[in-house]
């Protein structure tokens, strides 16, 4: 069975739903409570690349107050600056994110996860 990892926040309903989806399918995933054990910059870059996004904002909680407080809505910021911000402030990481089969998906909507399983 391929290694599957979920970046999870137990306080988030979407994250809990994603974990339930994996469990219902009998998939034993490594659960990373990213607020307790945040990914480092290298891991964030890997996730970003696996997501295949044009902008790191696609893996950020752009509606979070912290995002605006830190000035991350500045269009001149590059992906490296955005990923460093997530590394420094893991609460900015969108959740859930599932890594499987060399790919990643943000589970909003949950159907996105299906594409990587």
From Swiss-Prot:
GO terms classed as biological process: response to arsenic-containing substance
Site residues (Important for activity), renumbered to this chain: 8, 61, 95, 108
Keyword Oxidoreductase part of the UniProt annotation: yes
Pfam families cross-referenced by the UniProt entry: ArsC
Highest taxon above the source species: Bacteria
Keywords, ordered alphabetically: Arsenical resistance, Oxidoreductase
Endpoints of the signal sequence: none
Cited SUPFAM superfamilies: Thioredoxin-like
EC number assigned by the record: 1.20.4.1
Cited InterPro entries: Arsenate_reductase (IPR006659), Arsenate_reductase-like (IPR006660), Thioredoxin-like_sf (IPR036249)
Active site: 12 (nucleophile)
Catalytic reactions on record: [glutaredoxin]-dithiol + arsenate + glutathione + H(+) = glutathionyl-S-S-[glutaredoxin] + arsenite + H2O
Cystine pairings recorded for this chain: none
A GO MF term: arsenate reductase (glutaredoxin) activity
Family from the record: Belongs to the ArsC family.
NCBIfam families: arsC (TIGR00014)
Chain's role: Involved in resistance to arsenate. Catalyzes the reduction of arsenate [As(V)] to arsenite [As(III)].
Name assigned to this protein: Arsenate reductase
Organism: Neisseria meningitidis serogroup B (strain ATCC BAA-335 / MC58)
The organism's taxonomic lineage, starting at the top: Bacteria, Pseudomonadati, Pseudomonadota, Betaproteobacteria, Neisseriales
